[in-house]
């Protein structure tokens, strides 16, 4: 246990979950690996200080409850208070797509990008069917599962999610134009930059930027220098608007430009045609003669790393791979 988090030592929450170590941080609060002391099972625990200026873990826990049972939505074990924290106990998952992108030397093959795109579209669609938009679609918020779920992609971090329509009446939230940017500027839709209320189309457009980030290794509006955060957002917005989709997607299959143009063309209240978007990439996948065998780029690397470790140590130990493998 690192001395810096000494206060968390022997910290047991929900009567049976013992904190082990910090494994990450979400939009609000830190994530810890914990063990269920009754059966030895590993879980993830999200902690938020009760003194937080804008507490949102209770909100996030309610959202997870609404989404429970969806494919690729982590299962919630417990929500409550412990010491001076709000506590959310959930399934332990594997590394994020950002972790895996780095693990693969920031290069994904087209096969991997297309297999991911299929699952990512489905995860966002599911959240939308439950009347919410995510509003922070980025590689860090998509995690691979572990064990028998190791090929399944999970969507996490619903701290910024918002209800976009009424459950009963299906009444859509009204169009507004005075909003501050919510989410991560790098992947934000153009309309989000312009202060327009977000809706389903914005989650889909953000996904388009995530896919091109994987294809290109970086986006043209990354690494822009500015004195203030506001000025940086301005610069990102300007660069995004002045980069034609065709330029952004140059050198890659036309389907990526088709995807982005489709998303940008959606009206505020319009439901995206998720099946059309999945089919776009599925047909491309087949055209490229790939097999949908869940062999991702990191699957190969993990196997190589494990083999090297086994041969060098004479034992079948796992080599150092991102946390959660």
From Swiss-Prot:
It holds the Pfam family Pkinase. Phosphorylated by MTOR in response to mitogenic stimulation, leading to its activation. It is found in: Cytoplasm; Cytoplasm, Cytoskeleton, Microtubule organizing center, Centrosome; Chromosome, Centromere, Kinetochore; Nucleus speckle. Its EC number is 2.7.11.1. One of its GO terms (cellular component) is nucleus. The modification Phosphoserine is found at residue 4. SMART domains: S_TKc. Residues 17-285 form the Protein kinase domain. Casein kinases are operationally defined by their preferential utilization of acidic proteins such as caseins as substrates. Can phosphorylate a large number of proteins. Participates in Wnt signaling. Phosphorylates CTNNB1 at 'Ser-45'. May phosphorylate PER1 and PER2. May play a role in segregating chromosomes during mitosis. May play a role in keratin cytoskeleton disassembly and thereby, it may regulate epithelial cell migration. Acts as a positive regulator of mTORC1 and mTORC2 signaling in response to nutrients by mediating phosphorylation of DEPTOR inhibitor. This is Casein kinase I isoform alpha. It comes from Rattus norvegicus (Rat).
């Amino acid at each position: 246990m690192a001395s810096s988090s000494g206060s968390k030592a022997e910290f047991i929450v929900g009567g049976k979950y013992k904190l082990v170590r910090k494994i990450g941080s979400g939009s609000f609060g830190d994530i810890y690996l914990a063990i269920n002391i009754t059966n030895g099972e590993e879980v993830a625990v999200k902690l938020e200080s009760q003194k937080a200026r804008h507490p949102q873990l209770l909100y996030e826990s309610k959202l997870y409850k609404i989404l429970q049972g969806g494919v690729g939505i982590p299962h919630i074990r417990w929500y409550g208070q412990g010491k001076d924290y709000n506590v959310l106990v959930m399934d332990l998952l594997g590394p994020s797509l950002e972790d895996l992108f780095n693990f693969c030397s920031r290069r994904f093959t087209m096969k991997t990008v297309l297999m991911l795109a299929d699952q990512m579209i489905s995860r966002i669609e599911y959240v939308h069917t439950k009347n919410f938009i995510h509003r922070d679609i980025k590689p860090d918020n998509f995690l691979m599962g572990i064990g028998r779920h190791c090929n399944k992609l999970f969507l996490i971090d619903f701290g910024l999610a918002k209800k976009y329509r009424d459950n009963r009446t299906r009444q859509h939230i009204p169009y507004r134009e005075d909003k501050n940017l919510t989410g991560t500027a790098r992947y934000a839709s153009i309309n989000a930059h312009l202060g327009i209320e977000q809706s389903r189309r914005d989650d889909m457009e953000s996904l388009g930027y995530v896919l091109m980030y994987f294809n290109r290794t970086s986006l043209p509006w990354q690494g822009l220098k500015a004195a203030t955060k506001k000025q940086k957002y301005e610069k990102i917005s300007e660069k995004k608007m002045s980069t034609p989709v065709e330029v952004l997607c140059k050198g890659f299959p036309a389907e990526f430009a088709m995807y982005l143009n489709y998303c940008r063309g959606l009206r505020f209240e319009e439901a995206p045609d998720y099946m059309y978007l999945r089919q776009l990439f599925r047909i491309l996948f087949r055209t490229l003669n790939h097999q949908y065998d869940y062999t991702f780029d990191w699957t190969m690397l993990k196997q190589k790393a494990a083999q090297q470790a086994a041969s060098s140590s004479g034992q079948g130990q796992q080599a150092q791979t991102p946390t959660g493998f």
